[in-house]
Amino acid sequence: MSGILLFIGIILLVIAIHDFFFTTLSGSGTGFVSRNISILSDKIIQVCVKVFGQKTYNYNGLFVNLMILFSWLLLIWGGLFLVFSSNPEAITNSSGKVANFWERLYFTSYTLSTLGMGDFTPSTAIFKMLTGAFSFFGFIFFTSSMTYFLSVASALVNKRTLSKSIYHLGKTPREIAKNILNFDSSFTYQQISELQNLIDKHAVNHHAYPVVHFYRQSKKRDSFSINIARLDEAISILLYAEEENKYREELKVLRSSLSDFLEDMEKNFASNLLIQKNAENSYSFPTLHSKDDEKELQKRRNIVQGLFGSENYTWDDIFNKS
């Protein structure tokens, strides 16, 4: 028995299984493997965008998800294959002949797929138990993966609903601010409350299923980063305007929800965002006298600019109708 193959196989299995269950069941983000595969996949998409254009973003989330699934399969398949290969006589065919390299690879694949053809069998009690355990794991793997992807799809629907809600509220920050003030008061209160609920829900989904971050769209009007930036700037206009408005307290609560989301973005997606230290000053606010307020506003603009900058947008896209 080859101890090196056995050791490497076990290490690969432990890494893959931990990453799989942490990502799909913990609701606390992604494992080390999934996180790095996501970052790498996104960088590949960014290269493709330069070659094929913005339409490539329509495949961003799909590509990241498939790459994560492929990495899990590859690690588990490879790890189990190495464990079986650690003992050349572990797997035999129906005639008792020892399986060769390709036959062990085939046996590993149909063990994980729970196919159970029966033309190859493990020869020892330990490998029989191992085969049974990973046949059961294969069933859990595919059902848990589908459940996870359904949860991601639900989170994606909420993200796009939020983006659409902001877009229909106004096409520029000033238009959003103007509409909030000019709408019927009961409708405005309702809109602020609904936006807060959608943002809070998206923040929770974003933390539980970080892959949602990578689902982008090619059209500017549908871009989540564009619309969330416009909303944040609109709230800044309303909160730092010289004129008082009756929605100030409600807007502060909405602002707080946005702040939590932006902080999570900065903490967990800094490598995917083009965050700069000094974002462009889009507006000057006469009532913004506090240094702390200036720093807070600059910080959130840096994060927001990093968000839409990662999709090759600029502040001009935020302030111009699309």
Describe each model-derived feature in a short phrase:
Residues 178-180, 191-195, 213-216, 220-322:
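Soluble C-terminal extramembrane regulatory/interaction domains of multi-pass membrane proteins
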